[in-house]
């Protein structure tokens, strides 16, 4: 007689909907609850839970809806049995067929460590690499899934505009069109703009080209009217470090929403809050963050009160051993930005919050190439205000865009040269 026959009941559970990124096969689930703990503790969105008891227990999203977290796909890496897998990657390739390349993420300024898996010329998936100083073992969903846009609208050959239509051309024809136009134009009428994801090698080559060949100082890496002081490198860095956030005992957000501007950084702030119940204060109501925070104002007058020791926050900063003040880009766009930044910096210096041991002053950049461009001093001679005003007034005759797609101006008679990898907004207006 057979002694291996199954006598008990089999577990057969219908697959749950968890959104467009996570594919579920719940019959594989062993109820380890890693995904529940991740959603509740790390992501800060308690949308996963267990219902039922004993052998009837099931993992589910409470209302059959997508996980509303920018870290949601990390549950795929956490699941030990393949009950949660990547929906866009399913049936795309076998792991042993893929070439694995270790690299750095460019979707934000954090620089998460990632591994890119390619099959032939196609990027199939992006996975996190462990780096305890930066991203630990997490990456944002944007980092993980932005690769699906890489194969669309690739610029694989030069294009020249003929009769208002971009037509493929040879490199010789493209260079001839560019050199003829540049040689007939005065250097002060030529401007260049560096893009958000332009690597430092290209940026340096562009700077060299503008200084030595064109002899123009109109090269700018900012596409918005931003105040930045590049006299000292610490004026534009995240000085407390991402890992340092964990020991901070007071966090002040000034005009920034780290949940969307730097997702991985936000997870560190949440980690600190859960561990130490650190006080988090925000100047500006930034909406739903994954931890409790106190909004003290929606205007910049409060900053002046803090500097003048007229606000309760002043005393908290003085008493704090490791304060962390994070300036967002939205503050640096203000006309009062030079005053706000410099005075707040002086205030921190006076109270010994900027020293060799700990620097409380932090700038949270949005783009991966920002700090590299500042390091290379790719900033127009006077300020971004002047060059962007000239751009809006159509004072330039030639614009060279190095992967820059965010400029806000109306094209009139400018001759636009676009250098980039994809047919984005910049390529569509190029000549």
Residue ranges: model-predicted function:
Residues 1-8, 12-13:
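Single conserved hydrophobic/aromatic residue that forms the stacking wall/gate
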Residues 3, 47-49, 113-115:
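Short, surface-exposed charged micro-motifs
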Residues 10, 14, 46-59, 226-228:
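Short, conserved phosphate-binding/catalytic loop or strand-edge motifs used
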Residues 18, 29, 41, 46-49:
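Hydrophobic alpha-helical bundles that form the membrane domains of multi-pass transporters
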Residues 21:
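Extended, Lys/Arg-rich, non-catalytic nucleic-acid recognition/anchoring regions
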Residues 25-26, 32, 36-37, 43, ...:
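Catalytic alpha/large subunits of respiratory electron-transfer oxidoreductases
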Residues 48, 84-85:
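Short hydrophobic beta-strand motif reused across regulatory alpha/beta modules
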């Amino acid at each position: 007689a057979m002694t291996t026959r199954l006598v008990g009941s089999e577990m057969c559970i219908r697959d749950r909907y968890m959104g467009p990124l996570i594919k579920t096969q719940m019959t594989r689930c062993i109820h380890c609850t890693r995904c529940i703990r991740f959603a509740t503790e790390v992501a800060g969105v308690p949308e996963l839970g267990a219902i039922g008891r004993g052998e009837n227990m099931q993992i589910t999203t409470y209302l059959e809806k997508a996980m509303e977290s920018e870290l949601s796909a990390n549950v795929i890496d956490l699941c030990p049995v393949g009950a949660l897998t990547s929906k866009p990657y399913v049936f795309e390739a076998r792991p042993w067929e893929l070439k694995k390349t270790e690299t750095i993420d460019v979707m934000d300024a954090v620089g998460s460590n990632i591994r890119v898996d390619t099959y032939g010329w196609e990027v199939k998936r992006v996975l996190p690499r462990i780096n305890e100083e930066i991203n630990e073992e997490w990456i944002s969903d944007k980092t993980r899934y932005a690769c699906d846009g890489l194969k669309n609208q690739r610029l694989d050959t030069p294009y020249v505009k003929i009769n208002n239509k971009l037509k493929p051309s040879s490199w010789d024809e493209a260079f001839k069109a560019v050199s003829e136009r540049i040689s007939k134009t005065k250097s002060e009428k030529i401007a260049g703009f560096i893009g958000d994801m332009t690597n430092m090698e290209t940026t340096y080559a562009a700077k060299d080209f503008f200084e030595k060949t064109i002899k123009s100082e109109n090269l700018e890496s900012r596409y918005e009217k931003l105040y930045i002081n590049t006299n000292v490198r610490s004026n534009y860095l995240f000085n407390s470090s991402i890992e340092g956030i964990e020991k901070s005992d007071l966090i002040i957000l000034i005009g920034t929403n780290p949940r969307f501007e730097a997702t991985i950084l936000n997870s560190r702030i949440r980690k600190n809050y859960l561990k130490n119940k650190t006080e988090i204060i925000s100047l500006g109501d930034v909406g739903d963050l994954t931890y409790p925070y106190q909004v003290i104002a929606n205007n910049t007058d409060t900053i002046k009160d803090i500097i003048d020791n007229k606000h309760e926050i002043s005393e908290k900063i003085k008493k704090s051993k490791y304060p962390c003040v994070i300036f967002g880009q939205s503050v640096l766009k203000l006309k009062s930005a030079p005053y706000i930044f410099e005075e707040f910096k002086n205030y921190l210096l006076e109270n010994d919050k900027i020293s060799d041991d700990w620097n409380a002053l932090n700038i949270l950049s949005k783009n991966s190439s920002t700090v590299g461009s500042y390091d290379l001093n790719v900033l127009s001679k006077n300020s971004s205000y002047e060059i962007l005003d000239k751009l809006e007034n159509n004072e330039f005759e030639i614009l060279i865009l190095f992967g820059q797609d965010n400029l806000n101006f109306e094209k009139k008679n400018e001759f636009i040269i676009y250098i980039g990898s994809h047919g984005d907004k910049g390529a569509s207006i190029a000549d």
